[in-house]
Every structure is written in structure tokens, then in C-alpha cells.
Amino acid sequence: MAATAATTTSSHLLLSSSRHVASSSQPSILSPRSLFSNNGKRAPTGVRNHQYASGVRCMAVAADAAETKTAARKKSGYELQTLTGWLLRQEMKGEIDAELTIVMSSISLACKQIASLVQRAGISNLTGVQGAVNIQGEDQKKLDVISNEVFSNCLRSSGRTGIIASEEEDVPVAVEESYSGNYVVVFDPLDGSSNIDAAVSTGSIFGIYSPNDECIVDDSDDISALGSEEQRCIVNVCQPGNNLLAAGYCMYSSSVIFVLTLGKGVFSFTLDPMYGEFVLTQENIEIPKAGRIYSFNEGNYQMWDDKLKKYIDDLKDPGPTGKPYSARYIGSLVGDFHRTLLYGGIYGYPRDAKSKNGKLRLLYECAPMSFIVEQAGGKGSDGHSRVLDIQPTEIHQRVPLYIGSTEEVEKLEKYLA
């Protein structure tokens, strides 16, 4: 009985709507004629005919409500944004081109391979020294050599890299012509490798530039025999940090963290071991304006100049607050910088009596890290000037580095002035 009544009522409503539409001087909104005015011109887009039947109005309102509900759908807790997907979105927005997307993907692949090697170093007998010395005069660890090969091979196979410059190479290396591309990539394949044997945090650092000129140096060339053209090529590879298109680092620790900037904010991705993909975990990272943490190797204190000693002594003084700065030092630039980026404070590797120009390399350590910290709202300085403004004169040029929260770096600069 109730079903019959419902059917009758429904039929009655439909019949009433039909009669209303038929008697109206205006066409129904469901009719194609409703898209045009009386003189045959098309009505403006988005304008509705409000003189339609009440039954049609109910249908439209229901449709609008359904659309709103769909738009307000909550993001699934299982929805992951991978580094590859994120890069493709940046490409679609015009932030980067397809070439740079491929280069970045190649770098992320190299980082995954190195992460695996680091995690299995003790098992695979990859600890200890290689028995060779690099251009810096440093004993090469086994993983230094292997990581450099991994990075170089991934960049060569991308087909989008023209020149690569590494901490472990004497000179910039031109990628074979059949595989060469447009980008210059500088990198430290394994920063903090002295920590490998103790399973302490290490990392890889990279920066990407557009080329100023074509490099013709081959990896078989003897640097002492280079002519004027080759030397000019090296100078052209040495670009200031202001020219960086992208920079980042990958930290190999309790988790594998890939931090990246394309010049518009800093983003962090964590390697998911289940899927083997870097997953977006932090967006638009901002370093605190100040932080009561300093990260210096105080073993070199006696070799520092008096101004820097005074600065460090004052940090240790409790002062009116009764709370001195906390000292934190890992011995890995990537590890110490990552903590500073998240918690605030200052990291420093100054010049001293032994290292007149400091120890860190400008092109592939100081400049990329300074680019990242500035994108996060911090500051990178050599104690007197902005790191990104320094024009390198050689591939392995060293400079002092003070990097971190803006207020902390500016405070140090006043001491050193």
C-alpha cells in the first residue's frame, strides 16, 4: 500500500513538472534551446535559466552537492607522493624541463645504490681504505671510489649530462659525445666517509648548473698537460652558487633522506624500503631564525684566530639566561647540516693555522649547501661575505663555511669583522 502511494506521488510530481514546463514561455534548462536567447545568440557560459521547473531545480542542487562532496574528499592515508611523481608535477607546472627531471631521477638512483652499499659495507668488506690518494691528498676509502663510479655512471647513462665534476676527480670530465647532454653536475659522492667504519651518518652532495661552454677535457687527460682551451673549460665549469639550478643532498643514516631544492623552497623525501621509492615527507622546510646549537670541531680550537675563539667562548657562557649553547658535532657535513636545518643554530668549519682556506670545497660542498639553506630562510657565509657570491677559480677550491640560522650567522660575522 505504501509503495503504491509512493509511486502515485512520484508520478504526480513528474506530471506536474511536465505541465509546468509545457506551459512556460521559456524553454526547459534540459533543452538545447535553453543555451540560446530569443534572438538566436548563445547565452553566456555559466549562466543558468532560473525559470525552470522545480523538479529540475532539485536535480541541479543534488548534482552540485555531489560535486562539492567529491571535491572535499579527504586525502587517503595510503596516498604517497614519490620523488618521481613530484618531479613530473614540477615539470607540468613549468618549474623545470624534462631534461632536468631525468638528471634528478638519475641522481636519486645513484643515491639508492650508494645507500645500499653503505648499509652493507661491513658485510661486503667495503670498509677501510682503498690504498690510493685523491687530488685533495686524502686517503680514499673503498666506498669513496665505488660511490664516485656509481654517481658518474648514473649521470652518464642519463643522456642529459654534459660535464661532471667530482671530489674524487682531478678535473671536470666530459661525458662521451654519444651520451652527452646539457647540464653540469658537481658532486661529493660520499661526504663523511671517515665515519663509514663506525657506521655513523654519511651523505652525498650535489649541485646542477647550466653549462657556460663545452668542456673538452677527457678523463684520460693529464692535468699538467692541459692547454689553454682545456684550462678555459675548467674555469667555465667553476660557476658561482648564484647560477645553481638545483641542489641537494642524500643522508645515509637510520633512514635515507633526500633533500632537494629547485630554487623555490626545500623539500625532503624519505626512502621507503618497502617500495624502494623516495616519498615526500616534508614540504617547504624553513630553518628557525635562531637556534642555541653550535657545531664546530673544537679539537682545532688552539689553531683558530682570537676573534673566533672569543665567539666560541661566549657561546659557552651561560649569561643572563643561565643556558649556554649546546655543542653537537658528528663530523659529517651532511649530518651536521641536516640537524641544523631542522633545529636551527650554526655549523662552522673555519680556516685555521693548518688549513689556511678552510677544509670544505666551495664548488660541490659549500655552494650547494648554501643554496639549500638560503631557500629555507637561512644564511651561508665565509665569515665575511655570502658564499653564493664567491666566484670559484679552481675546481677544488676551499673556503671557510659558516651556515645555519640567519641570526646566528650574522652574530658570528660581527665577531669576525
UniProtKB/Swiss-Prot annotation:
User: Which cofactor does the UniProt annotation name?
Assistant: Mg(2+)
Q: Which positions bear N-acetylalanine? A: 60
Phenotype for residue 361 to K: In hcef1; reduced growth rate, dwarf phenotype and delayed flowering
Could you tell me the keywords of this UniProt record? Acetylation, Calvin cycle, Carbohydrate metabolism, Chloroplast, Disulfide bond, Hydrolase, Magnesium, Metal-binding, Plastid, Transit peptide
Output one GO MF annotation. fructose 1,6-bisphosphate 1-phosphatase activity
Q: Where in the cell is it found?
A: Plastid, Chloroplast stroma
Region annotation (Disordered) ranges: 24-48
Q: Where does substrate bind?
A: 191-194, 297, 329, 347, 349, 359
EC code: 3.1.3.11
Per the UniProt entry, what are the Gene Ontology biological process annotations, in alphabetical order?
Answer: fructose 1,6-bisphosphate metabolic process; photosynthesis; photosynthetic electron transport in photosystem I; reductive pentose-phosphate cycle; response to cold; sucrose metabolic process
Q: In which pathway does it act?
A: Carbohydrate biosynthesis; Calvin cycle
Q: Kind of enzyme, top EC level? A: hydrolase
The protein's matches in InterPro entries, at most eight in alphabetical order, are given as: FBPase_C_dom, FBPase_class-1, FBPase_N, FBPtase, Fructose_bisphosphatase_AS
Co-factor binding details: Binds 3 Mg(2+) ions per subunit.
**Could you tell me which residues form the transit peptide?**
1-59
The protein's annotated catalytic reaction(s) are:
beta-D-fructose 1,6-bisphosphate + H2O = beta-D-fructose 6-phosphate + phosphate
Q: Which GO terms describe its cellular component?
A: apoplast; chloroplast; chloroplast stroma; cytosol; stromule
Q: What happens when the gene is disrupted?
A: Reduced growth rate, dwarf phenotype and delayed flowering.
Q: Which Gene3D superfamilies match?
A: 3.40.190.80, Fructose-1,6-Bisphosphatase, subunit A, domain 1
Which HAMAP family does the UniProt record give?
FBPase_class1
Family membership, please give it: Belongs to the FBPase class 1 family.
Q: Its biological function?
A: Catalyzes the irreversible reaction from fructose-1,6-bisphosphate to fructose-6-phosphate and inorganic phosphate, to regenerate the primary CO(2) acceptor molecule, ribulose-1,5-bisphosphate. Involved in the regulation of photosynthetic electron flow and sucrose synthesis. Its activity is critical for normal plant development and important for the regulation of a wide range of metabolic processes.
Q: Tell me the subunit arrangement.
A: Homotetramer.
* NCBIfam families recorded: PRK09293.1-1
User: What protein am I looking at?
Assistant: Fructose-1,6-bisphosphatase 1, chloroplastic
Q: Which gene encodes it?
A: CFBP1
